[in-house]
């Protein structure tokens, strides 16, 4: 619905992200466009369900062409210089990709904090964050650090941008607002629900979700320390 001339959703971009394009008459006094979507969600809980409990990487790891894209550096996701230095220090001599990812995630949980003064979700400039030593930010900043360190450690990783769809029922016992919220009828106002999380790829398994930033967000909202049992429970989840 609306007074647009044309509107469509396309995935014709480098990362296949669904993007809405719309045009209006240049003289339109008001630009209206209403979109209705039916969303289906599912839980992805590989750690909770023990799906990776006995994970062992293949002897010879070969990534497909599309996965190899997520090993490459970008403008904000550098994989050399200070990023590589941090990655090497964090993972040490570990060779198992899952354990390397866990070391990186735990390092971020232990060392990074959420800064609510950051505009939007942050810009995710990892090199700047590590160079300045100001280990703070919002979701794009914190989860981009995970992605950069993972790539620098030889693990394909990517940011996933989207919108929280309401309350996270399973995480509500740790925080009523940090992971999304809804009213008494279960209806959520998603206009402020923009979020960036991350995923890393394990050969022989697939993409694994990780959200170091939400641990920092919960800590700030609930005034929890890194060592608090709730912090560690959310980090493990």
Task: Specify the residue positions occupied by each region the protein language model found.
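Intrinsically disordered, low-complexity N-terminal segments that are enriched in acidic
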Residues: 1-45
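Low-complexity, flexible helical/coil segments
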Residues: 15, 69-77, 178-179, 235-236
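Tryptophan-centered motif/residue detector
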Residues: 22-24, 107, 197, 207
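Extracellular structured ligand-interaction cores
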Residues: 30-36, 195-197, 207
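Secondary-structure boundary elements
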Residues: 31-33, 37-137, 145-148
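Short, low-complexity, polar/charged sequence segments that are solvent-exposed and flexible
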Residues: 52-61, 178-179, 217-220, 228-231
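Active-site neighborhood of thiol-dependent amide/isopeptide-bond enzymes
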Residues: 93, 97-102, 106-196, 203, ...
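A recognition module on extended beta-rich or small alphabeta surfaces enriched in W/G with H and D/E
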Residues: 189-190, 197-237
